[in-house]
Amino acid sequence: MPTLDSGKVCRIVARARALDTGRPENFPEDRARRELLEIIRTLNEREQVELVALCWVGRRTYAPEEWEEALSEARAAHSERTAEYLVGMPLLADCLEGGLARFGQGCSGFEDGNL
């Protein structure tokens, strides 16, 4: 089971949604992408590894019961480009929300204003 704070995951989900679904005209895509990259880069290595594993559980590459295996693979794949890997992942927000849901968690009630 992930130990990564779900509030951090929901913050990333909100930013990823802004990037995926369009932004207000005064919030260009490159700025949204840079902000999302920065949020992920501020996570420590353990948190980045868990975020990748959570994505993989969310997209059903791994089942929740295979969490330790997903973590092990994510740990082995971790690099200085992990943030870029995540931001480049299609449907990042959906993968993260799906991962949270598979562990009985979610982002309902999360306020985008908490960013």
Where are these predicted regions, by residue range?
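Structural motif
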Residues: 39-48, 90-91
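Short helix-capping/linker segments at secondary-structure and domain boundaries
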Residues: 57-69
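Short, hydrophobic/amphipathic alpha-helical patches that form generic packing surfaces
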Residues: 49-59
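Residue-level detector of well-ordered alpha-helical segments, enriched
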Residues: 8, 47-51, 66, 95
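Short amphipathic alpha-helical segments and their helix-coil junctions
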Residues: 24-42
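Short terminal alpha-helical segments
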Residues: 2-27
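Helix-rich interaction surfaces within compact, conserved domain-sized segments
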Residues: 74-115
